[in-house]
Amino acid sequence: TTSRLSVYLRCLNALHAAGIKTISSQALAEQFNLNSAQIRKDLGYFGEFGVRGVGYYVEDLRDHITKILGLDSPHRVGIIGAGRLGTALANYNGFGRSNFTVVALFDNDRQKIGHRIGDAKLLVHDVDDVARVIREEAIDVMVIAVPAKAAQRVLNQVMSVGIKAVLNFAPVSLTARRGVKVKTVDLTTSLESLSYFLSQPQSSAITEPLSQSRSKENFPQRRKGAKAESF
């Protein structure tokens, strides 16, 4: 449900920017290729937001969903892994629109530690200093962008100092303790799903319903004997 709320919020932001004041669930569904019944069910779980004969007040609903998702308060983000992916994530300016600010990068490469990289000129810290920097920078969300073999160890490190929200880009499923949420971004499985679709006879342009578009957290492992890489 929370993933769909994020999509609704993006849609409502677009409507608000366009100056639209009210919208029905049906119109919202048609305009953004959503499911009107699912919209009503999801929103009904959190309260009564619609007005009979009017629909939803765009600005009010946007503000409610922002609070439900906890986006009315700022979040400070650290990224472990200052390679191409980690640097690209640090440079992404879309996080700020959702009240996330990347404040620190970490790596184990001595040639990167102590240098400032990316558009924001973020200092790359030694990953061994992650506990101290998390406390000093008041980081509450960590992003893991390291090779698969290092990911669980890195997760254990950040969990040990109280981090409860982790976005994982490493190609491996991770084990988290109770009370810690790990969200894995699985690009390979999504591409494999598209490959399956293309391989079927009479494939047509079908967009999966939002509620069915989640994928499992599995990546192929690095082949045996592959060279270890720093992060």
PLM-predicted stretches and their roles:
Residues 22, 26, 31-76:
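HTH-adjacent hinge/linker in prokaryotic transcriptional regulators
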Residues 83, 147-151, 224:
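Short beta->alpha connector loops
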Residues 11-16, 120-201:
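Phosphate-bearing ligand-interacting subdomains
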Residues 1-21:
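Extreme N-terminal segment that seeds HTH/winged-HTH DNA-binding domains in transcriptional regulators
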